[in-house]
Amino acid sequence: GVSRGMRILGEARAATCNGRDVLKVGSHPALNALLHELPPEMREMEKLPFHLLAAGIVSGNPERAIEEGRYILVPVIAANHEERSVTLTLPPDDGDRVFWAMRQDLAAEDDMRRLVGELADRLGAAPNFGLLFSCLGRGPYFFGGEDRDLEAVKARFPGMPLIGAYGGGQIAPMFNGNQQIHNAAVLALFGAEAAAPSSGSRTTETKAGPRV
């Protein structure tokens, strides 16, 4: 499973785009729309913290797209105060449904606890071991010196063997197939599944089964 750890800012609306520049979101200039959704203290900053901001581009039917994870996150890299436009690292298509999102430690912590709970419910039993891969931008540096993702897993499964690493990105199963993502945490839990014994046999085989 994947924890994106983003705070969603507002609803997805149709965007007017020119290359990598988002000119409008809904009926408002893109920069105005972004500022409207930001926390008040961030709107007053001399320079916006672009390293924390992203645009979510919805795929398919916009209804419940955010809840179902049918979107890609594209980092914001610049804003034009004269044109009131916002520049992304990748060009969206004109008319795409776009929403704004922000990296936030509390949102990431809540999302990781949600993921751990969902995977535990799907597994249905205590896992034998787990794998946790986190982006360098999501580890202790992001959480003020402690890895709250790791703490969430250990709190739910104390004593469970856990292997992991920090990296510059992760490859994870997304709605549109396996994709490389950033600033996220990927968790897999593994448990034993009992295979049905063959007729007349009293032996039982087990095999490791992942829950991603």
Regions found by a protein language model. Give the residues of each.
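Small-residue-enriched flexible segments
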Residues: 1-143, 147-160, 165-212
